[in-house]
Amino acid sequence: MTPTLPDIKPIPIKERSSVVFLGRGELDVIDGAFVLVDTNGIRMQIPVGGLASLMLEPGSRVSHAAVSLASKVGCLLVFVGEGGVRLYSVGHPGGARSDRLLYQARLALDEVLRLKVVKKMFSLRFGEDFSDAYSVEQLRGLEGVRVREGYRKIARDTGVIWNGRRYDPHSWGSADLPNRCLSAATASLYGICEAAVLAAGYSPSIGFLHTGKPLSFVYDIADLFKFETVVPAAFKTAALNPREPEREVRYACRDLFRETQLLKRIIPTIEEVLTAGGISAPAPPDWVVPPAIPVDEEG
């Protein structure tokens, strides 16, 4: 009997390319390939299994077969507005684990444990020890001051005129060039951070510093990397005054994510942050009922 080939497993998130933006076309599976078909019928093959996430802008349509294949290979589909500013919907790629969700929820619900996690986030962001008696309000105030100064410093270094972080998500074109570049750049970062959060088995919505949003935990994690990655990339792009700033800043972010090996760092950082709470993931009781159908056997 000829031995069968083993099932193909998804590529680990750390080995994937970061994010691709697509619009004005239809995603489908044709002859086994994941393709984008534009309005002229021209096909462009997308290596969906090697991507962390696909950001789908206005004008994009997705077939059932394309969604199914993206889910099987673990590529996150994110439906966004022009420039990636507004999030409309997310296709879950699988990977969530109840033990890790319960662990995350326990850390978030306990005020003492939650503060430990928040202080660890601030320590990683600003390179200082915040384990002493700081309240969340004090940390937020400190964050605001340092973030504003961070923007001003990078603007000075790149020669960009900076009037503050201002944009209207309902009027994309009304923002100035630096803010448009920043919005497009942070959208790219949010996409890969959400893919990493889901790949690690956690919930994007259970945040610690951010709360009340579908992507609260994504924002928490993205903030840990923002000022070393997408903010400098956005200002450098704005300094060039390109004709298509959103397109150029996405290319810059893609290259930067690859150079810094960001996808290899996000999940270990998530674990480091949550470990600061000082508890272990809860073990299930002996009497719980296991799944009737294992995940890898579901159709």
From Swiss-Prot:
Required cofactor(s): Mg(2+); Mn(2+)
Keyword check for DNA-binding: yes
The protein's enzyme class: hydrolase
Molecular function in Gene Ontology: DNA binding; DNA endonuclease activity; metal ion binding
Entry keywords, A to Z: Antiviral defense, DNA-binding, Endonuclease, Hydrolase, Magnesium, Manganese, Metal-binding, Nuclease
InterPro entries assigned: Cas1 (IPR050646), Cas1_I-E (IPR033641), CRISPR-assoc_Cas1 (IPR002729), CRISPR-assoc_Cas1_C (IPR042206), CRISPR-assoc_Cas1_ECOLI (IPR019851), CRISPR-assoc_Cas1_N (IPR042211)
Positions annotated to bind Mn(2+): 143, 210, 223
Its EC number(s): 3.1.-.-
An individual GO BP term: maintenance of CRISPR repeat elements
Keyword Magnesium belongs to the record: yes
Protein family per UniProt: Belongs to the CRISPR-associated endonuclease Cas1 family.
Cited NCBIfam families: cas1, cas1_ECOLI
Annotated function: CRISPR (clustered regularly interspaced short palindromic repeat), is an adaptive immune system that provides protection against mobile genetic elements (viruses, transposable elements and conjugative plasmids). CRISPR clusters contain spacers, sequences complementary to antecedent mobile elements, and target invading nucleic acids. CRISPR clusters are transcribed and processed into CRISPR RNA (crRNA). Acts as a dsDNA endonuclease. Involved in the integration of spacer DNA into the CRISPR cassette.
Quaternary structure note: Homodimer, forms a heterotetramer with a Cas2 homodimer.
Name of protein: CRISPR-associated endonuclease Cas1 3
Gene designation per UniProt: cas1-3
